[in-house]
Amino acid sequence: MKVDVLLGLQWGDEGKGKVVDVLTPKYDVVARFQGGPNAGHTLEFEGQKYVLRSIPSGIFQGDKVNIIGNGVVLDPALFKAEAEALEASGHNLKERLHISKKAHLILPTHRILDAAYEAAKGDAKVGTTGKGIGPTYTDKVSRNGVRVGDILHNFEQKYAAAKARHEQILKGLNYEYDLTELEKAWFEGIEYLKQFQLVDSEHEINGLLDNGKSILCEGAQGTMLDIDFGSYPFVTSSNTVCAGACTGLGVAPNKIGDVYGIFKAYCTRVGSGPFPTELFDKTGDQICTLGHEFGSVTGRKRRCGWVDLVALKYSIMVNGVTKLIMMKSDVLDTFETIKACVAYKMNGEEIDYFPYDITDEVEPIYVELPGWQTDMTKMQSEDEFPEEFNAYLSFLEEQLGVQIKIVSVGPDREQTIIRYTEE
């Protein structure tokens, strides 16, 4: 057996949570492989809206095993709040959610450090979510981190050492803070965490594969936020690309099967950094309003723009995407024309690739297509798609070289249309 991977191809917020929930019935296991509570996966069904930050999106399927892998960073306080909210709505987590002992813990001082570093950067700030993600991964790489497995023995000593080291750094930054409430909630989260199955996830996952179980690996954020391949330094602190599933779960490269790449019919970005197709006019505001484009974790208004095919082709390349999934098609239902960026103009030269030194000065070169101006939210099969929408899909597939297997026409799990069903 091989694992399949589901990941975002843009700057995050593509709708991965909903798609995982839609795909989950065909899998036995859903495993999260990177990131932390800085990204929220939003799911809507049966009139309820859920935002998952650390827990895999397969948790809503009652018979599925869900695994938080070693590549994830976990805040015990936020995890406790998220898990208790799910349990209160009738979902049994403790039997079905397994957590890697090798996952690193976000400490209260990591969150303080995150805020202090951003404050020190002034106008050059990256625009982090303030959840302590960067400082936690920094400690991991510098071999100073505290892991989930550490809570089982000699924990107080390791925590005290990490806290003292962080306080020395904060002293140098001259940043005022109060840990009292953060620490109280954090240690309550630690006790709650002990109630779950803490596992050697790499052994568990490979054992499940050997026993013929099907596994879906769930990524967070998006390819353009990858620490190596994103628009550095305006990126996250982990590998959001397909290779991150190997290092974040302990899966060998030859065990990767299908790679599902998710993108919106337009583009959004939260925080600072280059965004070639960003719109600063009423069209951008209209997309934001119709798409409800506000961060599920921070509540920040997302920057909006037309779909960027240059960036998408780059993401498809570095991930080895085999199947595409287009989200939020319905947001563009009322537009008379739709634009798609097919190249950039940079330093007076036209280029069709995503460059190392991309800046805000990059000018998008667009192709304009007719809009479909049809309400697609109640459509149940591709046979109902308007001619203009089919033309848009064909144009995208020709440009990107990969079939668009799934189209989302609304936020609910039922508003999902599978294409190429003859396969």
From Swiss-Prot:
Annotated compartments: Cytoplasm
Keyword S-adenosyl-L-methionine in annotation: no
Gene Ontology molecular function, alphabetical: adenylosuccinate synthase activity; GTP binding; magnesium ion binding
Cofactor note: Binds 1 Mg(2+) ion per subunit.
Keywords in alphabetical order: Cytoplasm, GTP-binding, Ligase, Magnesium, Metal-binding, Nucleotide-binding, Purine biosynthesis
Binding site for Mg(2+): D13, G40
Binding-site residues for IMP, renumbered to this chain: D13, E14, G15, K16, N38, A39, G40, H41, T129, R143, Q221, T236, R300
Gene3D superfamilies hit by this protein: Adenylosuccinate Synthetase, subunit A, domain 1, Adenylosuccinate Synthetase, subunit A, domain 2, Adenylosuccinate Synthetase, subunit A, domain 3
Cofactor: Mg(2+)
Positions annotated to bind GTP: 12-18, 40-42, 302, 328-330, 408-410
EC class of the enzyme, as a word: ligase
Pathway: Purine metabolism; AMP biosynthesis via de novo pathway; AMP from IMP: step 1/2
Any Pfam family hit: Adenylsucc_synt
InterPro entries assigned: Adenylosuccin_syn_GTP-bd (IPR018220), Adenylosuccin_syn_Lys_AS (IPR033128), Adenylosuccinate_synth_dom1 (IPR042109), Adenylosuccinate_synth_dom2 (IPR042110), Adenylosuccinate_synth_dom3 (IPR042111), Adenylosuccinate_synthetase (IPR001114), P-loop_NTPase (IPR027417)
Active site: D13 (proton acceptor), H41 (proton donor)
Entry EC number(s): 6.3.4.4
GO cellular component, one term: cytoplasm
SMART domains given in the database record: Adenylsucc_synt (SM00788)
Binding-site residues, substrate: S296, V297, T298, G299, R300, K301, R302
Catalytic activity: IMP + L-aspartate + GTP = N(6)-(1,2-dicarboxyethyl)-AMP + GDP + phosphate + 2 H(+)
BP terms from Gene Ontology: 'de novo' AMP biosynthetic process; IMP metabolic process
Role according to the record: Plays an important role in the de novo pathway of purine nucleotide biosynthesis. Catalyzes the first committed step in the biosynthesis of AMP from IMP.
Family annotation (PANTHER family): ADENYLOSUCCINATE SYNTHETASE
Protein family according to the UniProt entry: Belongs to the adenylosuccinate synthetase family.
Oligomeric form and interacting partners: Homodimer.
Name of the protein described by the UniProt record: Adenylosuccinate synthetase
Classification of source organism: Bacteria, Pseudomonadati, Bacteroidota, Bacteroidia, Bacteroidales
